[in-house]
């Protein structure tokens, strides 16, 4: 039996050729954590969790690696904020204004009048409450499909998720095997389901 050796690294790291060659030679592949590319709930300014614009920019530092050894991270969670607008600096830590939100937790908001506003530069959307005092930054089926198309076209080894249960629908009468809102989009696109 063959055992794989992998690692997960922040997209924010920078490598020179010597270090990249040493790392790539030590592992079968590298999972790049290409999410949490925002201030989340630890910083001071809310923005997109998984902006393609930011991902492309940060991946410039990874060009010293063979793309066929790199998997990019996809997120089925985001961040919820209240009392701030995207890009507005908070008076204190963002944890006082928001929280982590899973895709399953986010979905009921759409049935309660929340609206989507697509950001063409980031290639992902914000969602706003009816009174616009709350918003969520999160991927949706369209942005996930665009990301996996881009990953595949770009010659990367693949993708991975953070995290599996955040969009899971438990088995039921109409869904005997269970399903995933976002993960299944990627699985179908790659011809695995």
Segments the model singles out, each with a brief description of its role:
Residues 16, 169-170:
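Short secondary-structure boundary/hinge segments and terminal tails
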Residues 11-23, 138-152:
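Short, acidic/polar
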């Amino acid at each position: 039996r063959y055992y794989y050796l992998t690692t997960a690294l922040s997209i924010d790291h920078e490598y020179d050729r010597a270090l990249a060659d040493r790392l790539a030679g030590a592992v079968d592949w590298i999972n790049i954590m290409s999410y949490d590319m925002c201030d989340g709930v630890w910083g001071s300014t809310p923005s997109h969790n998984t902006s393609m614009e930011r991902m492309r920019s940060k991946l410039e530092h990874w060009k010293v690696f063979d793309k066929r050894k790199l998997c990019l991270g996809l997120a089925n969670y985001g961040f919820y904020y209240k009392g701030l607008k995207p890009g507005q600096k908070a008076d204190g830590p963002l944890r006082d204004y928001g929280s982590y939100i899973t895709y399953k937790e986010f979905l009921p908001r759409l049935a309660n009048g929340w609206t989507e506003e697509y950001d063409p530069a980031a290639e992902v959307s914000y969602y706003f409450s009816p009174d616009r005092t709350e918003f969520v930054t999160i991927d949706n089926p369209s942005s996930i499909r665009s990301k996996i198309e881009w990953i595949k076209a770009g010659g990367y080894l693949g993708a991975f998720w953070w995290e599996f249960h955040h969009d899971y629908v438990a088995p039921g009468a109409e869904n005997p095997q269970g399903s995933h809102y976002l993960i299944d989009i990627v699985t179908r696109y790659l011809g695995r389901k």
